Amino acid sequence: MTQWIIWLAIETEAAKPEGGLFDFDATLPVMMVQLLVLMLILNAVFYKPLIKILDERKEYIQSNFNEAEKCLAQAAELTTQYETKITDARQNASKLTNTTRSEIQRFVSEKLEEAQKKADSELASATNKLELQKDEALKSLESEVQTLSTKILEKLLGIQIANT
């Protein structure tokens, strides 16, 4: 059977007239109709669904792109808000630090002043006590010096001196 198919193919090749791409005869309009029918079938079966899928994909990409732009704008806005809040927080922290520092300095200076006053008053009190003790010691020593000098004179002179 394969021999018959090969022989038939050879005979049809030999029966063809030699010429160009196709012959201008009654088969030309049939080929045009076949081409149009093929184009209509391909259009209905292949191209329209393909174009529909491509359009849907384009819309999907565009919607995702628009959503991404919205998210990007929202992220930029949130970043701006965040930076503003951070700046405000830093300023507030700086003010609080400065206020606290000045309060601590004031507190320390008050405590130092109180301690200085207390030390001065204790020093003055101690000085007064020492002065009083010195005066008392001098008075007691003065009377003792008087008594001792009288005794020394009595022993040296051998006379009794009356205490005045």
UniProtKB/Swiss-Prot annotation:
Q: Does the keyword rRNA-binding apply?
A: no
| Entry's transmembrane regions | 26-46
Please provide one cellular component term from the Gene Ontology annotations of this protein.
Answer: plasma membrane
**What this chain does, per the record?**
F(1)F(0) ATP synthase produces ATP from ADP in the presence of a proton or sodium gradient. F-type ATPases consist of two structural domains, F(1) containing the extramembraneous catalytic core and F(0) containing the membrane proton channel, linked together by a central stalk and a peripheral stalk. During catalysis, ATP synthesis in the catalytic domain of F(1) is coupled via a rotary mechanism of the central stalk subunits to proton translocation. Component of the F(0) channel, it forms part of the peripheral stalk, linking F(1) to F(0). The b'-subunit is a diverged and duplicated form of b found in plants and photosynthetic bacteria.
Q: What is this protein called?
A: ATP synthase B' chain, cyanelle
Q: Which UniProt keywords apply?
A: ATP synthesis, CF(0), Cyanelle, Hydrogen ion transport, Ion transport, Membrane, Plastid, Thylakoid, Transmembrane, Transmembrane helix, Transport
Q: Which family does it belong to?
A: Belongs to the ATPase B chain family.
Report the superkingdom from the record.
Answer: Eukaryota
Which cell locations does it reside in?
A: Plastid, Cyanelle thylakoid membrane
Q: How is this protein positioned relative to the membrane?
A: Single-pass membrane protein
Q: Tell me, how does this one assemble?
A: F-type ATPases have 2 components, F(1) - the catalytic core - and F(0) - the membrane proton channel. F(1) has five subunits: alpha(3), beta(3), gamma(1), delta(1), epsilon(1). F(0) has four main subunits: a(1), b(1), b'(1) and c(10-14). The alpha and beta chains form an alternating ring which encloses part of the gamma chain. F(1) is attached to F(0) by a central stalk formed by the gamma and epsilon chains, while a peripheral stalk is formed by the delta, b and b' chains.
Show the InterPro entries listed in the entry.
ATP_synth_b, ATP_synth_b/b'su_bac/chlpt, ATP_synthase_B_chain
| Cited CDD domains | ATP-synt_Fo_b
A GO molecular function annotation here is: proton-transporting ATP synthase activity, rotational mechanism
Query: Looking at the Swiss-Prot or TrEMBL record, what is one Pfam family this protein matches?
Result: ATP-synt_B
Q: Is Transcription regulation among this UniProt entry's keywords?
A: no
Q: Which NCBIfam families match?
A: PRK07353.1
